[in-house]
Amino acid sequence: MKHIPIAILCVLMTLTASAQQRIHAFFTSGVTFSQIEGDELKGFKQIGYTGGVGALVSLSENNRWGMSLEALFSQRGARSTSDTRYYLYYFNVRSNYIEIPLLLHWQDRHGGMLFGAGVSYGRLVRQPHGEIGFSPTFFVPDTTDKTFLPNDFMVVADARFTIWRGLQLNIRWQYSLIAVKRDWTFRYFDGYESDSEGNQVERWATKTNDCYNNSIALRLIWQF
């Protein structure tokens, strides 16, 4: 896995040399809004940081097509709280990744908007940290093992809008192609039943979910 970024960089350098086009380096910094698909909660409520460096290679003489490679630090996770009558919980976890996105870009004829799509490889550098607490109402996750898998392969959709000269506003969506945590067990309330003495008692069932990172990033890019 450690040779993947080097191989991608070599491909970009080869394309650049053959086309004799410029490489535009850039810095980027922004925030992520993320959730974990499969944790039984909804909403992009976990806020984290994303930032790093990258390079955009022009693949055509009119600069309409390009390819970019980035090296980023990104935070993802999930956060939600409730103290209603039926749901009593707090859920706040965050994971740190080093990621290498590779995107193909198309630029509009006026040069003000750049759209991209591609893939990203993320390496988990810090396991999810935070707190998970649930009262036994309706659903309860197994918190004995919060370990996530070390690799995250994501699909990426990207849009950049020029603000002024080399300054751009970037919106990016990413979703895991493979699970980052498998078979997370949840107990959930499944109604009532009668025990051997005829008393009505709660009935609980279990389910297991595979989990996927789902995030939206809002970034500023300064391109040289």
Predicted regions and their residues:
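Short glycine/proline- and aromatic-enriched beta-strand/turn motifs that initiate or cap beta-hairpins
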Residues: 20-57, 133, 215, 219-224
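Residues that define the transmembrane beta-barrel architecture of outer-membrane proteins
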Residues: 21-23, 45-49, 94-98, 151-155, ...
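Residues on the lipid-exposed face of transmembrane beta-strands in outer-membrane beta-barrel proteins
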Residues: 27-31, 51-57, 71-73, 100-106, ...
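Structural signature of outer-membrane beta-barrel domains
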Residues: 32-36, 74-78, 122-126, 174-180
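Outer-membrane beta-barrel translocator domains and adjoining extracellular loop/strand segments
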Residues: 37-43, 79-86, 127-136, 181-188
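Extracellular loop and loop/strand-boundary signature of outer-membrane beta-barrel proteins
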Residues: 37-42, 85-91, 140-145, 203-208
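Repeated loop/turn-to-beta-strand initiation elements of outer-membrane beta-barrel proteins
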Residues: 63-67, 111-113, 165-171
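Predominantly the C-terminal beta-signal and adjacent terminal strand-loop region
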Residues: 144-147, 152-224
